[in-house]
Amino acid sequence: MSKMLYTLGGWVARNRIKAICAWIVVLVAAIGLAVTLKPSFSEDMSIPDTPSEKAMDVIQKEFPHGPDKGSIRVIFGAGDGEKLTGKPAKKAIEDTFKEISKDDSVDSIASPFVTGTIAKDGTVAYADIQYKSSADDIKDYSIKHLKDSLKMADDEGLQTELSGDVPGAEMEIGGVSEIVGIILAFVVLAITFGSLLIAGLPILTALIGLGVSIGLVLIGTQVFDIASVSLSLAGMIGLAVGIDYALFIFTKHRQFLGEGIQKNESIARAVGTAGSAVVFAGLTVIVALCGLTVVNIPFMSAMGLTAGLSVLMAVLASITLVPAVLSIAGKRMIPKSNKKIEKQSTETNVWGRFVTKNPIMLSVCSILILIVISIPSMHLELGLPDAGMKAKDNPDRRAYDLLAEGFGEGFNGQLTIVADATNATENKAEAFADAVKEIKGLDHVASVTPAMPNKEGNFAIITVVPETGPNDVTTKDLVHDVRSLSDKNGVDLLVTGSTAVNIDISDRLNDAIPVFAVLIVGFAFVLLTIVFRSLLVPLVAVAGFMLTMTATLGICVFVLQDGNLIDFFKIPEKGPILAFLPILSIGILFGLAMDYQVFLVSRMREEYVKTNNPVQAIQAGLKHSGPVVTAAGLIMIFVFAGFIFAGEASIKANGLALSFGVLFDAFIVRMTLIPSVMKLMGNAAWYLPKWLDKIIPNVDIEGHQLTKEIQPEIDHEQKKQISV
């Protein structure tokens, strides 16, 4: 592969305009087509074969309600000291309905004065507006007309909010906070390269690759079920790895230029060596992300595949676009000669010396720090974000709060129960009544509707309003209590609703995490054994990754679930940990951890093979690869941290997990714990049984064999004046 990439890098360097034009054409085509085709995201997070999904299937089969029609709920709130049942407020609401009904696409309006959907104190009410078309087909004009009509009620001092199938929700790809992350990444690159111009180039190439992947994901929504959070996740990961991968090739190119190698040859060698490591690292991340498909959860599979696509584009940009940009940059990439810096670099290696002199202290401190941070993960609670976890000024949150204020917290977490009396031994109507009575007797039940049977009378729907909100532990306990009543008197109870769905998703993900973790850890151990030809180094690396994950979950629980520092991170409300965050973080952080492990430890192995001196090998790795890993880690942290301050709760959670995960893994595990433990192991760190050494393949990750092959061909170039 190194030889092939060497050839590719050389060709791109010589045909830079063609390469850049090709990328521009692909970028314009992808974005243009994505804009032309209106994105159609699917927010369906259901999982096949779960109890809540089975309940929905029964409802659709046994309670057919005709064509699927879009419905929007309008919530009204009275002014201070007023009631909606008063004449002025009632007239304003009725006039509003008259104005709304002028839209021909409106099928019906369920007035609260007819249906009785008014709070006991008369301060809050809601009306369901049903349209003739499905939710996806509700026209922008209809939404505008609805909002304009509500201004009539607003002018009378009423509060109006919308919930339900409201199209046109803002799609978050990026924002001010993400731009701040890019700016901080730019600062890191400027310090690393000592040039503002060069610092901007890796960001430019990363953004081009990201633009293509975003366009492809948007196009993909026309064919596949992709959630909007998948787009943000793909953008987050694609940008971070795109900058990092470009950084590795930029650094290698400058190193070769500093050795006196001609420009195009230097680019070819940089792509052949660092590019090989980038391809290996990228494929590792892609495999980890695509591995999310093994859990057999549709929306998780979509997240993994879209994020994997963004990493693939980052890799392709690194080995085809970056060489073209380097060729255009020309002599500007040559590092400035500074004898003082060269002398310091040669004679000193502060961190490497410190680590090898204090391995016990650093090992113990690193492990203790990560264990302490991991403690909160012991009371991890999983769930899915609801409108109550959004910012208080968010329209969905305002609607959520207004309904909770009028009808109680549990109104937003209603449970829909499907009662199946097919096998009932008594009269089916009496069996349904008994089931309702049993449910009313449970703790924390605010209200229960009478059973509404289907035509045949063998199925019925019962709606339960809990006393607590959808993500409250008490509500989750109520779901389990209702399910435990199943089969009494021959009535089977299937529960659905947001809380029931959350429980089922959490249970399925909890079952999937051990399987996925075993696959990832096993894959990592085998992979690193092949790369480093050692047993103990991979073992320590995997153990370090496990500490990274527990610490990452610990900080997430500490902040997101327990509510510590939520004001600092601008998180509106504390709540359960995003149900898919643990397994998603395992996949992403595994790939990134292997990146840092390969870039750092492969340099150590190279030195150990030469000198057979483990201490010298550790110091060489930290000296030569440490600065690049440090810069790459900081860039990742800044980019991911920018998403903590995004608007969407799920994106905030992922941004927090990934930024702290990289912090723990890059700086505590890879730069401190791993070299410290390797110092304690000495030569044993590189032990590999002879029989195993003969079996496993010899993998050249960073293209060292390539350098040996082409060196005779380019020796004469080093004697010439650099031609740029």
Swiss-Prot record:
Q: Could you tell me which InterPro entries the record lists for this protein? A: MMPL_dom, Mycobact_MmpL, SSD
Keyword Transmembrane helix listed? The answer is yes
Subcellular location, in the record's words? Cell membrane
What is this entry's stated membrane topology?
Multi-pass membrane protein
Looking at the record's lineage, which domain of life comes first?
A: Bacteria
Q: Which UniProt keywords apply?
A: Cell membrane, Membrane, Transmembrane, Transmembrane helix
TM regions (residue ranges): 17-37, 179-199, 200-220, 231-251, 277-297, 309-329, 360-380, 512-532, 539-559, 575-595, 627-647, 655-675
- Entry's Gene Ontology cellular component terms: plasma membrane
PROSITE patterns assigned: SSD
Inducing stimuli? Regulated by the two-component regulatory system YdfH/YdfI.
Looking up PANTHER family in the UniProt record yields: MEMBRANE PROTEIN MJ1562-RELATED, MEMBRANE PROTEIN YDFJ
- Give the protein family: Belongs to the resistance-nodulation-cell division (RND) (TC 2.A.6) family. MmpL subfamily.
The protein depicted here goes by the name Membrane protein YdfJ
- According to its UniProt entry, this protein's organism is Bacillus subtilis (strain 168)
